[in-house]
């Protein structure tokens, strides 16, 4: 009997393959930021979902978190362009963690779908090595929507799969345990 291979959060984040957006379930008492430890060389940017209730607020929060250039136009096309560029933020890959994601565009499913499409387009461009910055190589780009189990029920359709943040033992990796000195 062969062991079932389970994709860990770390191996998922290092991958330059879809899915580009995933739902990260945060347990009571946990902070989303504590669940995501970016692999070496990958940039982790935290976007506050509570600040993304309308498209205008979402654009402002992304501009703040990702330090968009002054020319950012605060519209969907400009967001898509900046997410596929990021030359001012050099890294081997990108992880966007949206905390309190149940608050992202809660009253407009059409705008929410547009937002997801833009994130997936950016992920695909980076994953195919077609993003700006002359990447020419597949680059990880993932967006984690962090919600509690209770908040998850607030949106009927998230449009993405859940990813497990629980530590998973990978085949061939031995965990170091602290030695006890007597």
Residue spans for each PLM region:
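Short, structured protein-protein interaction patches enriched in aromatics and acidic/basic residues
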Residues: 80-110
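Helix-rich interaction surfaces within compact, conserved domain-sized segments
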Residues: 104-168
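Acidic, His- and aromatic-enriched active-site or binding-groove loops in soluble protein domains
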Residues: 169-174
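Conserved beta-strand segments of the P-loop GTPase G domain that flank and frequently precede/overlap
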Residues: 46-49, 96-100, 144-146
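Conserved helix-adjacent loop modules within structured domains
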Residues: 48-52, 56-92
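Mixed-charge, glycine-accented linear interaction segment located at domain edges/termini
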Residues: 160, 179-182
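N-terminal intrinsically disordered, cationic/polar leader segments
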Residues: 2-53, 134
């Amino acid at each position: 009997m062969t062991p079932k291979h389970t994709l860990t959060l770390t191996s998922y984040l290092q991958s330059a393959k879809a899915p580009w957006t995933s739902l990260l379930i945060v347990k009571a008492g946990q902070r989303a930021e504590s669940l995501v430890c970016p692999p070496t060389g990958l940039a982790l940017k935290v976007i506050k979902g509570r600040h993304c209730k309308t498209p205008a607020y979402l654009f402002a929060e992304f501009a703040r978190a990702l330090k968009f250039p002054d020319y950012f136009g605060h519209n969907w096309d400009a967001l898509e362009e900046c997410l596929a560029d990021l030359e001012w933020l050099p890294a081997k890959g990108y992880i966007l963690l949206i905390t309190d994601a149940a608050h992202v565009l809660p009253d407009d499913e059409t705008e929410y779908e547009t937002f997801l499409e833009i994130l997936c387009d950016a992920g695909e461009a980076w994953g195919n090595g077609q993003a700006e910055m002359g990447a020419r190589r597949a680059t990880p780009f993932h967006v984690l929507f962090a919600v509690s189990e209770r908040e998850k029920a607030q949106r009927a359709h998230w449009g993405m799969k859940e990813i497990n943040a629980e530590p998973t033992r990978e085949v061939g990796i031995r965990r170091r345990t602290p030695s006890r000195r007597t």
